[in-house]
């Protein structure tokens, strides 16, 4: 995510190293590099111009802290200004005091509108809401079917009247249905187009007038860069959108859309899509995103993901097993399942502080390692999982054959598990600190 931009910004910061004090000439030279990095990231020209002006003024002004080194001063200022550029603080969804809360999803075809209607509904379902998806795209072949498939996977009902009724009537009937059945959130999936046209916009304006939504969320493909800003501006002028969902952010190395949309439209980015799976959606935090761009990590989002995957009852049982030194490969398997539920490994690693942008682009992070580890453990008997010491050479061959792996991989797993048991024993013997054991109980690293 934004690896290219982050790498170039960090290279620009090198201009300020080994400087005793920042001069106007130093700042000017560094700002030239930062400006180039932003323009190459397809950030809107006006945004770049104003951003550079503010950062330059602050870098040579009285706001600079004398306790920081010049490079640190500039990074601090750039971090604060990137945060401000993207909205400053998180903009939450506007929940109606009288249910249902109606969210109207709009956007061009191919931006991921239908999928993200489902993702958003799924996210709020996990928070205890009762969402309903309403299929108002009667034009695109299989659009209704696509929404129904998404709904089935998430176990969220989909309201549809087929493709012969007008989208305005479907939207109105969908709201009535939600009121009758007690759904407290309604996500209206409207029709997209390959390009903006008057017919599309008039239909969307008619739906807006008919259902008076609490939110009009525009889904925008972050991969199209500057064009996404133009799309957002057009939709905002005609519909007065309330927020933006930036999709495909996991594949965007530049970041032009994220840095430009709020500034140009005045409307906040509320959510970001970070993958193809239906749980890969996150609330947008400008401060966290700025830190991630600059390689400072995003520990808070990492904690959010860990808490979402965290099972308190399971953790308590695990802590007890660690204390009693009865931790088995079945327990190890449960920990792997929790790790997988947190999401893509590369994305998780990129949130760690100190991992510079671009540092992971050449790293070969093999996601199949977890799957192979699970296969090895599943190929063991219950007794072998409870007492891995009994696994001799012939058993290893059988396990390797059953899991489609090699004896070496089986040996590696057993060695790693043995090392983990030794570490647990050390923690247990160190005064049996409850805090220490609890921290270990929450440890989700696979190896």
What are these regions (language model features)?
Residues 16, 42, 78, 108, ...:
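Residue-level signature of catalytic and energy-coupling elements of molecular machines
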Residues 141-147, 228-231:
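Short, glycine/polar-rich helix-capping loops at beta-to-alpha or helix-loop-helix junctions
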Residues 2-19, 288-447:
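Long amphipathic alpha-helical segments used for membrane anchoring, targeting, substrate engagement
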Residues 127-132, 154-158, 184-186, 211-216, ...:
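Short, surface-exposed connector motifs at secondary-structure boundaries
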Residues 9-136, 143-163, 170-190:
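Primarily NTPase-proximal linker/entry elements flanking Walker-type ATP/GTP-binding cores
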